[in-house]
């Protein structure tokens, strides 16, 4: 093993259609106060035709430009909403980015997908298999939501975020300082799209599989999200030797503002250091962490050398955390 995976550039993309809480309240039994008080979400973006791959390409282009390069050796796409069940979306994204021929694959770890994608790409780099990678989290959850289910429709948004990683030294800014990953398949039904796979497949007599919509059991998911993100992020702090007080920015998966603040409280990280982005984009699943990082960059919340802790939780159940010293990079 040699070197480290180092963050070199960041890019994001959002679809054009802005969906406010007020718009949703016109056909759902809800209102702006109900949504904000329970989730912290004020609006989200939904695609009017752009696919997950389309958003991934746009974010990828911006990340490559931010990194000052037009090529990488590997493309990893984290998504729950691929363009097709088969084939994977990443090879098409790579081709459209002018990267045909490089290794490219999808990762399905739901809202933990971006952390899993980072871990996979960094492992390739440190093993000497590739010298650089593009990691993308992209989602179009609007395509899998039940429009009449207020427990999910008010939460999720569409978007994409991408980062370029390069080979470098573990002691330089931007190097990822280890990962903590985990899963619990016994709780797989807490977050699930029941239909469409080999257990409940489409057939000639029933072309639309039952249970085609995304479902989530909110209360237990909330509890497990807080527990698992706290444990995982805590393990990463132990590994890096950082104290909670030394963390400059905590960037968690943007599922719910109450979850993020609960995790920060349990970790004893100052709540003012927690980055919140879901108020403007909702829960964008695998795209949420890079989107939040981009916003933090744009608002001057991240400076070179800052200690940044990332943590996520998602269906599977899955969870993961990583950390880095923030580099001097461009976010587009």
From Swiss-Prot:
Gene Ontology terms: cellular component = cytoplasm
Where do the catalytic residues lie? 111, 253, 283
Matching entries from Pfam families are given as:
ACP_syn_III (PF08545), ACP_syn_III_C (PF08541)
Can you tell which superkingdom this protein's organism belongs to? Answer: Bacteria
State the EC number(s). 2.3.1.180
Q: Which UniProt keywords apply?
A: Acyltransferase, Cytoplasm, Fatty acid biosynthesis, Fatty acid metabolism, Lipid biosynthesis, Lipid metabolism, Multifunctional enzyme, Plasmid, Transferase
**What is this enzyme's class at the first EC digit?**
transferase
Catalyses: malonyl-[ACP] + acetyl-CoA + H(+) = 3-oxobutanoyl-[ACP] + CO2 + CoA
Major localization class = cytoplasm
User: What processes in GO biological process is this protein linked to?
Assistant: fatty acid biosynthetic process; secondary metabolite biosynthetic process
Listed GO molecular functions?
3-oxoacyl-[acyl-carrier-protein] synthase activity; beta-ketoacyl-acyl-carrier-protein synthase III activity
Copy the pathway line from the protein's UniProt record: Lipid metabolism; fatty acid biosynthesis
Annotated segments matching region ACP-binding: 254-258
Entry's localization field: Cytoplasm
Q: What does this protein do?
A: Catalyzes the condensation reaction of fatty acid synthesis by the addition to an acyl acceptor of two carbons from malonyl-ACP. Catalyzes the first condensation reaction which initiates fatty acid synthesis and may therefore play a role in governing the total rate of fatty acid production. Possesses both acetoacetyl-ACP synthase and acetyl transacylase activities. Its substrate specificity determines the biosynthesis of branched-chain and/or straight-chain of fatty acids.
Q: What is known of its domains?
A: The last Arg residue of the ACP-binding site is essential for the weak association between ACP/AcpP and FabH.
- What NCBIfam families would the database entry show? fabH (TIGR00747), PRK09352.1 (NF006829)
As for family, the record states: Belongs to the thiolase-like superfamily. FabH family.
HAMAP family the record matches: FabH
Indicate the quaternary assembly: Homodimer.
Name-wise, this protein is Beta-ketoacyl-[acyl-carrier-protein] synthase III 5
- Identify the species of origin: Streptomyces coelicolor (strain ATCC BAA-471 / A3(2) / M145)
């Amino acid at each position: 093993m040699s070197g480290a995976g180092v963050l070199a550039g960041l890019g994001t993309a959002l679809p054009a259609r802005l969906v406010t809480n007020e718009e949703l309240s016109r056909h759902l039994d809800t209102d702006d106060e109900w949504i904000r008080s329970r989730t912290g979400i004020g609006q989200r973006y939904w695609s009017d035709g752009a696919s997950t791959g389309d958003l991934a390409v746009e974010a990828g282009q911006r990340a490559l430009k931010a990194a000052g390069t037009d090529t990488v050796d590997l493309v990893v796409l984290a998504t729950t909403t691929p363009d097709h069940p088969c084939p994977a979306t990443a090879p098409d994204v790579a081709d459209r980015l002018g990267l045909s021929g490089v290794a490219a694959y999808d990762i399905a770890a739901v809202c933990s997908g971006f952390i899993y994608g980072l871990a996979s790409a960094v492992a390739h780099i440190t093993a000497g298999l590739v010298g650089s990678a593009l990691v993308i989290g992209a989602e179009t959850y609007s395509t899998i939501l039940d429009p009449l289910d207020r427990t999910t429709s008010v939460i999720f948004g569409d978007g994409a975020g991408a980062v370029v990683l390069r080979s470098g030294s573990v002691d330089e800014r931007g190097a990822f300082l280890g990962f903590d990953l985990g899963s619990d398949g016994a709780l797989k039904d807490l977050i699930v799209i029941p239909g469409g796979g080999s257990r409940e497949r489409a057939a000639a007599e029933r072309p639309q599989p039952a249970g085609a919509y995304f479902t989530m059991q909110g209360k237990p998911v909330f509890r497990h999200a807080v527990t698992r993100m706290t444990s995982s992020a805590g393990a990463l702090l132990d590994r890096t030797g950082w104290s909670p007080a030394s963390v400059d920015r905590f960037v968690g998966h943007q599922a719910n503002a109450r979850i993020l603040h609960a995790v920060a409280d349990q970790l004893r990280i100052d709540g003012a250091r927690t980055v919140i982005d879901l108020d403007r984009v909702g829960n964008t699943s695998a795209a949420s962490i890079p989107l939040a990082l981009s916003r933090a960059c744009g608002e001057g919340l991240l400076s070179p050398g800052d200690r940044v802790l990332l943590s996520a939780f998602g269906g599977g159940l899955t969870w993961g955390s990583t950390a880095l010293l923030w580099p001097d990079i461009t976010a587009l």
